[in-house]
Amino acid sequence: MAKYEILYIIRPNIEEEAKNALVARFDSILTDNGATVVESKDWEKRRLAYEIQDFREGLYHVVNVEANDATALNEFDRLSKINGDILRHMIVKLDA
């Protein structure tokens, strides 16, 4: 299984319950499509290097995933692009 790290930035003015629901939803998208979530944790609220959608800071969330193929990652990528609460995301394949 290949190991991946997903980092996404959530808009800072989201309510705590909505943020938890968003994180749970995207974790379940990964597991429903065949990936294993090793770790999913909030990083911190950080200042952005430049404004994104009129926000100067964002809530960073890191997910470590193991997957046999890219199905789960492609679905995560597709849905995070159309979700208004996620400002940016990045998927990186980790060296074994």
UniProtKB/Swiss-Prot annotation:
GO BP of this protein: translation
Top-level taxonomic group: Bacteria
Pfam family, one: Ribosomal_S6
GO molecular function: small ribosomal subunit rRNA binding; structural constituent of ribosome
SUPFAM superfamilies (UniProt xref): Ribosomal protein S6
Keywords assigned by UniProt, alphabetized: Ribonucleoprotein, Ribosomal protein, RNA-binding, rRNA-binding
Disulfide topology: none
Keyword Plastid: no
InterPro entries according to UniProt: Ribosomal_bS6, Ribosomal_bS6_sf, Ribosomal_S6_plastid/chlpt, Transl_elong_EF1B/ribsomal_bS6
GO cellular component, as recorded: cytoplasm; ribonucleoprotein complex; ribosome
Main function: Binds together with bS18 to 16S ribosomal RNA.
Family of this protein: Belongs to the bacterial ribosomal protein bS6 family.
Name of the molecule in the record: Small ribosomal subunit protein bS6
